[in-house]
């Protein structure tokens, strides 16, 4: 009935170790099917991302411990030269459930509240289910984790506020110009940072985006992806600065690509209509003197990082609420686990009483009328349910600190002389 979790993540191991243990989808399927076909596990799932590789296993043998699973995956990845057991964490029973709930809720992420992890957990579950490795325990564990993540997202603010430079830039632009769909935007630089900023803008309903890049084909590819198909030659974009309400720069360069003189002329043509320049370059792309011009809002990476720090601080204040949700769901999950543990005993108890009832009724089958037999059957059913009510209620009751589930199960099995159950999980 145990659920073990072992793995490496950004807290326990550096990236070069995490890379050695990570599994592709094909390797993931091979790994978990090997555990099950080898008789080592009843159920298994692997969550493998850039920041973590974690095993969730319902062992089929007492020998399959946390240490055993660490050694098993190290051997599977042929990583003995690089990876040691100390790089791993281990969780057991409800500790495993708590860990997955925290992971799914994005409070165990490298960036607090980074919501991408939930999709990755769902993908891990899909893979396990696809190869019939997700049984009743892992299925319930994962669906509870999905429910926890949904509650955390709707009932807390742990995922609110930008925590990346590109998203912080867009969030700031939206605060200054509330309706981005009405603004004309110039993106200078179509690299990774610029692309992210453009996609965040697009997600905020900005559609009037013009792109310029030293390599024009790269600008054209991004414009096509966004569906704007609007590109300016890099050699001539400065001639159009006055046309834009928002300018995002994300270019690798030693010199300023937009000077104070460039924007002074642009502002005169705009008749001082406000402009935001979001400088995502390092070194900076825009001359800091631009910020002194009237109706000019210039924000560089340092200013945006200040916004990010504030947002992370606000997110951390939500942690008590998140833990409260997790604690509540953990209690319910633990109670379900306990019910699962006693299910064989409840079934055996009911079966024994049904067997006794049927044997006794059989003795009178030819001594009484069919109507009398039906009445006797109805009466014995009622008596049986009343007798069984209390022992079943006791078995299902939550465990207190002075009690434990095995002693309850043993008591009932001994009192009612039940045969030892077959151990499956």
UniProtKB/Swiss-Prot annotation:
Functional pathway: Porphyrin-containing compound metabolism; protoporphyrin-IX biosynthesis; 5-aminolevulinate from L-glutamyl-tRNA(Glu): step 1/2; Porphyrin-containing compound metabolism; chlorophyll biosynthesis
Listed name of the protein: Glutamyl-tRNA reductase
InterPro entries, alphabetized: 4pyrrol_synth_GluRdtase, 4pyrrol_synth_GluRdtase_dimer, 4pyrrol_synth_GluRdtase_N, GluRdtase_CS, GluRdtase_dimer_dom_sf, GluRdtase_N_sf, NAD(P)-bd_dom_sf, Shikm_DH/Glu-tRNA_Rdtase
Binding site for substrate: 49-52, 109, 114-116, 120
GO MF assignments: glutamyl-tRNA reductase activity; NADP binding
One Pfam family matching this protein: GlutR_N
Gene3D superfamilies, alphabetized: Glutamyl-tRNA reductase, N-terminal domain (3.30.460.30), NAD(P)-binding Rossmann-like Domain (3.40.50.720)
Disulfide bonds: none
Keyword Oxidoreductase: yes
Family named by the database record: Belongs to the glutamyl-tRNA reductase family.
Domain of life: Bacteria
EC number: 1.2.1.70
UniProt-listed GO biological process terms: chlorophyll biosynthetic process; protoporphyrinogen IX biosynthetic process from glutamate
Active-site residues annotated for this sequence: 50
Organism whose genome encodes this protein: Chlorobium luteolum (strain DSM 273 / BCRC 81028 / 2530)
Cited SUPFAM superfamilies: Glutamyl tRNA-reductase catalytic, N-terminal domain, Glutamyl tRNA-reductase dimerization domain, NAD(P)-binding Rossmann-fold domains
Biological role stated in the UniProt entry: Catalyzes the NADPH-dependent reduction of glutamyl-tRNA(Glu) to glutamate 1-semialdehyde (GSA).
Binding site for NADP(+): 189-194
Site residues by UniProt (Important for activity): 99
Keyword line: Chlorophyll biosynthesis, NADP, Oxidoreductase, Porphyrin biosynthesis
Self-association and partners: Homodimer.
Other comments on record: During catalysis, the active site Cys acts as a nucleophile attacking the alpha-carbonyl group of tRNA-bound glutamate with the formation of a thioester intermediate between enzyme and glutamate, and the concomitant release of tRNA(Glu). The thioester intermediate is finally reduced by direct hydride transfer from NADPH, to form the product GSA.
Reactions listed under catalytic activity: (S)-4-amino-5-oxopentanoate + tRNA(Glu) + NADP(+) = L-glutamyl-tRNA(Glu) + NADPH + H(+)
Entry domain remark: Possesses an unusual extended V-shaped dimeric structure with each monomer consisting of three distinct domains arranged along a curved 'spinal' alpha-helix. The N-terminal catalytic domain specifically recognizes the glutamate moiety of the substrate. The second domain is the NADPH-binding domain, and the third C-terminal domain is responsible for dimerization.
